[in-house]
């Protein structure tokens, strides 16, 4: 399995659910070779066990299975939007305005337009797919998917808030699920439970029939960070304020890791 460093932690290099079990010596080796401060992965748990950590997945989709309210919202999106596959160059040229509007709306940083274009062009070949939603001819939303055999990951979804009233997210998710899950027989995933920021997007996906694939959460640290985590953990409730968001996230993950530790055993 390949690994990469994300936000200071070494994590599996995949967008799809994976459930490795490592021995303590394997963990120490990965930390030493990578230079990361922490190692994070998701061991398996016994079938039928519910945990506070999970992957969001959708193995089956049918429009008629949605609630009446969801069906109405999808219909509104279908009537007001046009969902289409996009060529990489099309998204590179038109997508930055949508990205900028979405990030400004949520108070996030905005990359330079040329940086965005280079990143999209670099993803121009499979396994990447690009989808767009046009409202009155304008690109109001887009998604990036990664397709591998019988599975697909929803990697990116951005919506220009100016088009919220057109229900682009509903039209787009319906089209993606119909194409990949209902007709393509693939399982769609949207990564693991979000712990680093407040979001209701995964709750939105649950309304489309996504489910929770439960697992444990394992965190391993360098000796110095392990000492700091043990020291701060009893006082985690005091980590308040916007500037301490990363600390709260780490303590929340540590809490989950401790609660799921009895449910799995490491490799010998």
Report residues per predicted region:
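Conserved acyl-CoA
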Residues: 25-35, 171-187
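Residue-level recognition of alpha-helix initiation/capping sites
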Residues: 22, 66-68, 171, 196
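Secondary-shell segments that build the walls of catalytic and ion/ligand-binding clefts
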Residues: 168
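N-terminal accessory interaction module
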Residues: 1-42
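Active-site/acyl-donor-binding loops of N-acyltransferases
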Residues: 1-2, 6, 43-64, 186-268
């Amino acid at each position: 399995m390949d690994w990469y460093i994300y936000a200071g932690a070494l994590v599996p290099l995949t967008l799809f659910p994976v459930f490795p079990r490592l021995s303590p010596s394997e963990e120490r080796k990965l930390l030493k070779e990578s230079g990361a401060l922490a190692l994070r992965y998701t061991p398996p748990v016994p079938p039928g066990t519910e945990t506070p950590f999970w992957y969001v997945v959708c193995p089956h989709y049918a429009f008629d299975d949605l609630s009446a309210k969801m069906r109405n919202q999808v219909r509104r999106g279908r009537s007001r939007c046009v969902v289409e596959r996009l060529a990489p160059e099309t998204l590179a040229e038109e997508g930055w305005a949508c990205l900028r509007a979405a990030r400004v709306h949520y108070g996030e940083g905005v990359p330079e337009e040329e940086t965005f274009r280079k990143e999209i062009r670099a993803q121009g070949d499979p396994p990447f797919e690009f989808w767009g939603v046009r409202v009155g001819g304008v690109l109001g939303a887009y998604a990036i998917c990664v397709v591998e055999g019988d599975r697909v990951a929803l990697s990116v979804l951005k919506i220009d808030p100016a088009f919220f009233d057109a229900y682009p997210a509903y039209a787009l998710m319906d089209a993606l699920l119909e194409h990949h899950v209902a007709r393509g027989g693939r399982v769609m995933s949207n990564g693991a439970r979000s712990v680093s920021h407040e979001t209701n997007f995964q709750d939105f996906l649950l309304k489309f029939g996504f489910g929770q694939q439960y697992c444990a959460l394992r965190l391993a640290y360098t000796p110095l960070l392990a000492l700091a985590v043990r020291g701060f953990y009893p006082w985690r409730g005091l980590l308040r304020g916007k500037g301490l968001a990363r600390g709260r996230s780490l303590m929340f993950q540590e809490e989950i890791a401790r609660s799921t530790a009895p449910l799995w055993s490491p490799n010998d």
